[in-house]
Amino acid sequence: MNRLQRGSHVLIILIVVAVIGIIGALAWVFVSNMKDSDQSDSTPLSQVDTPPSELIWQQGEVGWQSTSTPPECPAQPIMKSPADISKATGVLYPGQTRGGNYKPHGGFRFDNNKNADITVTAPLDGFIVRGGSYLAEGEVQYTFDIMNNCGIMYRLGHLRVLPDNLQKIADTWPAPTADSRTQSLNPVVYVKAGDTLATSVGITETVNAFFDWGVYDYRQENEASKSIAYQQLHAQDKELSWHAVCWFDWLPSADSSKVKSLPPGDPTSGKNSDYCR
């Protein structure tokens, strides 16, 4: 019986050792996989994305069209906020009438800040395809249209002071007048998300700190443009009005919530919008 007991004990010990070994091996594999996953998830976007060599979107008679297959892009890309919106005191809703004219773009107001307190940065990689300078209340203002190869364009306006690289471009344009129309850039200029586009905004004489921001999706027409009445009202501005979006939900969640909590920046149109519901 003693021999049998000793044999049983040895067998049990061997089984326990084997089980521990198997558990240890499985744990090692699991931890290794977790490390690989963590390393993959934490890879900076700049290391996996390379700037496109050229713009694949061109404007023709029927609007913006891609000249080759666009990259795979989410239906609703998340963009960086173009400014520190913790300073914003109001939001201008896209798709409303302001100052007697229809505005497919929105924007931000910064009533508690000076003009030079607001820095505007690129919310998305893209190519500057158009730009313009014009006079508002006697002060020079700048506008840029920037197109991403996904087919998303954004417009930033009422920029007051530009960084040197963009000022060199603006210096080649005709002298500014009250006409705010833009002109094409040739060649186009690539900018990365986060690049500085302006170091002051709005009208400095009256310390009116604000800027315009519109986002346009050329992969499809917006819901508002499906209305016959809307089509008739905006037949002359299909490029912008038929493709403008409510960019509130195109921001990181915290910024999106902040924007939606802001009071409307236009006292007349308020929160009325053809795009934001």
Where are these regions (language model features)?
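Surface-exposed intrinsically disordered loops and tails
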Residues: 167-183, 226-275
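Surface-exposed, glycine-biased beta-strand/turn segments
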Residues: 44-143, 147-150, 190-193, 243-245, ...
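Short alpha-helix capping/helix-loop boundary micro-motifs
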Residues: 112-115, 180-185
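Zn2+-dependent peptidoglycan hydrolase active-site motif and core
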Residues: 123-183, 209
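Hydrophobic alpha-helical membrane-insertion segments, chiefly the h-region
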Residues: 19-30
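Short hydrophobic beta/alpha edge segments that flank linear recognition/processing sites
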Residues: 141-146, 187-217
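Ser/Thr/Pro/Gly-rich low-complexity linker/stalk segments immediately outside membranes or between
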Residues: 32-50
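N-terminal Sec-pathway targeting helices
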Residues: 4-20
